[in-house]
């Protein structure tokens, strides 16, 4: 099973504080310790880095540290536009949420030259080769040694499954930017689709029997057919 899964950490900075702003998802000693332990047991690790104007100064160093020192893969993501954010201090919604997104959003194009310089080669349509019917955002990938850096650039658009188009209110109201593209089991044992906020497609597996867990996986896999 080790070859078929990634264990994902959200790591947005090297420092706990950047420009006076607290980043709870930083590369702490505990994250490093757990990363090394999992890698020593042959498990694939990925760091998800959400890039904003606040942490952009640390992104390049964080990418190199993750790959060269910790032997993990990286996924760079731009900031999704949501109607609600918890922000860096207070919960904001509506117009305030949109203004926060405008203030923090930074295009992934700012990092393409850097990624080209540090990589051996790249593929612009990497993820669409791995996903049934090419759903989701077409993500590019840059390879460095044995590891890779995947880039989610929302400006490239997304391909949505028939389920999204026909049944999902988030899609119909323009509040989904990613569509259906991969299964994700969170640390709280909730099985869902990566990037998907549709609660009807979330399964709490805590205390479930084996047949119930299997059925949850099968139900979500149906969306890829």
Indicate where each model-derived feature is located:
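Conserved SAM/AdoMet-binding glycine-rich loop
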Residues: 1-17, 33
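Structured loop/turn residues at beta-strand edges in well-structured enzyme cores
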Residues: 2-3, 69, 178
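Short, surface-exposed linear patches
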Residues: 7, 28-33, 172, 206-207
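A structural signal for short, well-ordered beta-strand segments
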Residues: 7-9, 47, 195
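Short coil/turn linker and secondary-structure boundary residues
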Residues: 14, 26, 106, 196, ...
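Radical SAM enzyme [4Fe-4S]-AdoMet core and its adjacent flexible, acidic
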Residues: 17-166
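Flexible mid-to-C-terminal extensions adjoining Fe-S/redox cofactors in radical SAM and related proteins
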Residues: 159-225
């Amino acid at each position: 099973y080790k070859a078929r899964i990634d264990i994902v950490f959200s790591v947005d900075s090297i420092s706990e504080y950047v420009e006076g702003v607290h980043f709870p998802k930083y590369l702490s000693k505990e994250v490093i310790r757990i990363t090394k332990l999992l890698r020593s047991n042959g498990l694939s690790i990925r760091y998800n880095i959400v890039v904003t104007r606040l942490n952009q100064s640390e992104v390049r160093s964080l990418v190199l540290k993750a790959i060269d020192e910790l032997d993990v893969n990286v996924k760079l993501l731009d900031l999704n536009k949501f109607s609600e954010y918890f922000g860096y201090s207070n919960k904001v919604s509506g117009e305030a949420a949109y203004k926060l997104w405008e203030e923090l959003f930074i295009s992934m194009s700012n990092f393409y030259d850097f990624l080209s310089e540090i990589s051996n080669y790249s593929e612009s349509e990497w993820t669409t080769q791995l996903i049934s019917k090419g759903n989701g955002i077409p993500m590019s990938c840059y390879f460095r040694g044995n590891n890779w850096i995947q880039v989610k650039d929302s400006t490239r658009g997304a391909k949505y499954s028939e389920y999204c188009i026909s049944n999902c209110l988030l899609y119909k109201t323009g509040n989904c930017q990613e569509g259906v593209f991969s299964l994700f089991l969170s640390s709280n044992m909730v099985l869902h689709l990566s990037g998907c906020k549709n609660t009807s497609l979330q399964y709490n597996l805590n205390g479930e029997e084996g047949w119930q867990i299997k059925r949850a996986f099968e139900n979500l896999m149906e969306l890829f057919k």
